[in-house]
């Protein structure tokens, strides 16, 4: 499974666009929702994050060592889950968190939460722009020449800076929001948010430091979101939806098993 080509192009356009803020992104035959955050409220990734690691430094050497470990997972169940996590198109992207939440996340069952996740994806994606444009860090597959979990996406990814990871930023944004919506499931959804970012290292498309700093940026996005009345109102409604929600219709056993093995 890969991200749909039209969505990849649109996602990269969002990340590289000069039009930042609560605007509706459109193109490739699709209209995607506006985010909650106006441009002045977006976290400044250049101020918040350290410069991307440079070659020969301890940070880069650690990234390379962790990349080598991740490459050994090709063909495993964890690699297959990482391939699923690469898909940022909906409904698949939201459903990746259904098992951890214990509730089916869908346009039909939890419409406000579903839309909230789509809109906050826009906010999280926009927040990475300044650092991505500044550092233009090359991705692991461009350096090591090894395969990724989504080969059809490589042409798009080559032109989009690796640092910080947009997927990790988005996944951690979602995890923090879902933990607030369902405190009783907070450990599970935070673990899923962490594994969502780790999947990018396993896919050979991001370095570990890209993912780590993406999580910090995701936390900054959520902090900013709490200054927006519309977001807080939708968050309250989403809590009601989840409280009354239905268990996921899919079998969560395989995902749970894969992540349990990965943790140990």
Predicted regions and their residues:
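Bacterial N-terminal signal peptides that target proteins for export
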Residues: 1-8
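Interfacial helix-loop-helix junctions of multi-pass membrane proteins
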Residues: 195-226
């Amino acid at each position: 499974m890969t991200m749909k080509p039209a969505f990849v192009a649109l996602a990269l356009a969002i990340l590289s666009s000069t039009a930042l803020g609560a605007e509706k992104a459109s193109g490739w035959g699709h209209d995607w929702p506006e985010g909650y955050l106006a441009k002045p409220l977006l976290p400044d990734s250049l101020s918040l994050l350290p410069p991307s690691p440079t070659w020969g430094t301890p940070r880069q050497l650690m990234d390379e060592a962790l990349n080598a470990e991740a490459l050994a997972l090709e063909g495993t169940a964890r690699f297959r889950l990482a391939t699923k996590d690469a898909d940022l198109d909906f409904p698949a992207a939201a459903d990746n968190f259904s098992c951890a939440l214990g509730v089916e996340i869908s346009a039909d069952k939890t419409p406000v939460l579903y839309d909230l996740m789509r809109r906050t994806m826009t906010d999280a994606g926009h927040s990475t722009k300044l650092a991505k444009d500044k550092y233009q860090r090359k991705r692991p597959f461009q350096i090591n020449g090894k395969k990724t979990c989504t080969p059809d996406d490589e042409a798009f990814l080559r032109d989009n800076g690796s640092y910080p990871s947009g997927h990790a930023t988005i996944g951690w944004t979602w995890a923090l929001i879902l933990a607030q919506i369902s405190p009783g499931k907070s450990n599970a959804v935070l673990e899923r948010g962490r594994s969502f970012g780790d999947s990018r290292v396993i896919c050979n498309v991001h370095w570990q430091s890209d993912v780590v700093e993406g999580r910090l940026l995701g936390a900054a996005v959520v902090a900013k979101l709490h200054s927006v009345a519309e977001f807080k109102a939708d968050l309250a409604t989403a809590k009601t939806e989840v409280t009354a929600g239905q268990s996921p219709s899919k079998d969560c056993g395989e995902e749970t098993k894969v992540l349990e093995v990965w943790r140990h």
